Amino acid sequence: MEAIKNFFKWLLAFIVFLLLCVGFVLLYSYPQLRDRGFFDYLRHQQNPESVELPTAEELTRCADTPFIMPTAGWVGVLYGDSILGTSNHSGLDIFGLEGNGVTPVYAAYDGYVTRLPEWVSAIIIRHPEDPLQPSRQIWTYYTHMGDQAGYSHIIDQIPPGTVELPVKQGALLGYQGDYNGQSWRPIDTHLHFSIVLDDGNGSFLNETDIANTIDPSPYLGMRLNASCADRPPMCRPDPFCPPLASR
């Protein structure tokens, strides 16, 4: 009996400790989340008329930059962002506000689509010549185009197993969803978009590692790097981060 009492004492102490840790993380993160507009986004989700949320328009381009915006929505998580202690974010998260499977996703640039057989919600496009550095090949990655039950929102013309299907800039690829694989962590409907480096052998590197990806700022003509980003993003003639000394 004494052992059971001790067990519950330790369990209660652990729960209190865990709650304190969560509270500390939330308190530490609050200014970052506020400044990034997350609370406005949450308010908008509850009542769209309560706040005017700045959004990007699909298929638009900043001046003469090579890429178009691949989807519409609130550009909420930027390149290099860190949220609640997670690792640096390797791309952009663009949250559509119309519901699951509704907001279209388009090819940001001409290329060749591949969808691995096991990919439910993702495709990747090979671009033989980087429009900003033509000597190298790059890839653009699009994911979360499916629902939590595993139903894909990718168009039927790009079935699992598709390899090197030619696509033009602005071609429809699918629709935003909230599929997150086997992760315990639920997500809101959005598109994760990133630019991925080639491995030197004609394939793509692991997109989840930010070191294998490219800052999308100059490709879209906006400051999208978390270290100097405009929030909300806007077209700029100077999308690169200024030197640290001048910030």
Which stretches of residues belong to each language-model region?
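Small beta-barrel nucleic-acid-binding modules, principally OB-folds
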Residues: 84-98, 129-134, 138-145, 155-157, ...
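Active-site loop architecture of trypsin-fold serine endopeptidases
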Residues: 176-190
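Zn2+-dependent peptidoglycan hydrolase active-site motif and core
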Residues: 107-160, 189-192
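Surface-exposed, glycine-biased beta-strand/turn segments
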Residues: 25-122, 126-130, 169, 178, ...
